[in-house]
Amino acid sequence: MSGRGKQGGKARAKSKSRSSRAGLQFPVGRIHRLLRKGNYAERIGAGAPVYLAAVLEYLTAEILELAGNASRDNKKTRIIPRHLQLAIRNDEELNKLLGGVTIAQGGVLPNIQAVLLPKKTESHHHKAQSK
C-alpha cells in the first residue's frame, strides 16, 4: 500500500519550547525575534536569547522577591508600585542599576535630614542635677 495515513513511519516527537529546554519562564523565542527585528546586529547566535532571557528572569525574580517583602511589611497581600519603589531604592545594587528610572505612583523614600531633627536636650536630667 501507499505510505499515506497515520500508520507507518516514525511518530513525530512533541515539540519542546526553547524556554522549557533552558528551564526558564521567560520566552526565549520571543526574545530571539525581538533581537533580530531590533537591528542590534546582523546575526544573532542561538545562545544569546537564552542568556538574555535568563538574566531578565533573574532580575525580575529579585525585584519581585524584595517587593513582596515590602508588601508583607506593610501588611498588604498585593504588590503595588510603591512596594516596587521601596524594594529598588532600598537595595544598593538595584538602585544603581535603575538609578535613572522613574516608577509611576512610586513615591519617595522617607528621609529626614539630621540637621532638621529637633536637638536632643538634657533638660530633665540636667535640671535634676543642678537643684
From Swiss-Prot:
One of its GO terms (molecular function) is protein heterodimerization activity. The keyword Acetylation applies. It comes from the Eukaryota. Residues 7-19 have a biased composition (Basic residues). InterPro entries: Histone-fold (IPR009072), Histone_H2A (IPR002119), Histone_H2A/H2B/H3 (IPR007125), Histone_H2A_C (IPR032454), Histone_H2A_CS (IPR032458). The modification N6-crotonyllysine is found at K37, K119, K120, K127. The modification N6-succinyllysine is found at K10, K96. Its main location: nucleus. The modification Symmetric dimethylarginine is found at R4. The modification Phosphothreonine is found at T121. The modification Citrulline is found at R4. This is Histone H2A type 1-A. It comes from Homo sapiens (Human).
